[in-house]
Amino acid sequence: MKFFMAMKPPTVTHQEKQVRVVNGKPVFYEPAELRNARAKLRANLASQKPLSPYDRPVELVVTWCFPRGKHRDGEYRATKPDTDNLQKLLKDCMTEVGFWKDDCLVCREIVEKFWAEIPGIYIRIEELT
């Protein structure tokens, strides 16, 4: 399966959870920006989810296309956020929406970040044999 979600990719990542102390105990929470990014990803992914979740090993290919600004279309984005942090939030959302039973099924992964004329996230999933 493959699809493109035309959207401005979120730059906030799963690593940006916050902590506060309540009654002497640490409580972790998601700031509003992270909650909004998660909701945006879930909404876009929901319309693309497979009829039944993957339950076998898969390859996941993701191309993050960020608004190019002053950069050339197709130029690699060698700035933050890091690909591993972007992927964590995306794969968590894909699990929540029902792409697979668990993201541990992603056994091969290719991730790229580019500056692009048309921003969005390209995703391809293939079952491994």
Regions found by a protein language model. Give the residues of each.
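Acidic, proline/glycine-enriched N-terminal capping motif
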Residues: 1-129
